[in-house]
Amino acid sequence: LIKAHSGEKAPLLPASAERPSWFNPLVDDLADRIQQRINQAAHVTPINLVALAILGTPKHAISRPDLLRFLELSQQLLRDLPYGPRVSMTEMAPAEMIDYALQMEWIQCKPHPLGDVLSAEGESGVLLSYFRNNISHLFAVAGWVACCFLNNRRLSVAGVVRMGQQLYPFLKSELFLPWDEEEFARRTEQVADWLVDREVLSKSSDGVFLSRPRE
């Protein structure tokens, strides 16, 4: 499954007219804009999503129900809160994605009395990192919100946003994200509300705090 997209054009004429002393900053800025446009024209394949899920687990292994749930949420997030109008995504259902990844031998299935375990071992795990990295920017905000609750059960919405804004310059430069700090803050709030709607997180009755479910 191969699909090519064309990104939005970045005009070169204004750049060529700049003073020579501005050349290096201009090239850096142009490179950032080109990379942002490449990111905004991403196509999400089944293997991208499977890699994102499995490589995010401690031992690169996940139960089939958990993987199905992750794939379903990931697809729905991209549909409900699109990264940009040029991003497209596989039409496969989550179960079809798993079957496809197994058929292509990107992952393995180990039978278990409590349910099948799907994993990526050896070279497959290394190669899958390429597919995960190609779509990391699409899930940067959701990943940040989720990260906040790895070691915290309850945080204020404002706290999640504030900490994210402090980290955002690094995320922006590493992943070539398109938003400014205020846009990132709004995006963070949107993603948090989306996770609440999907019962991944819960929000206090006054709307101030977010909580993850008790284990």
Protein language model regions, located:
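Membrane-interfacial terminal anchoring regions of lipid-handling membrane enzymes
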Residues: 1-215
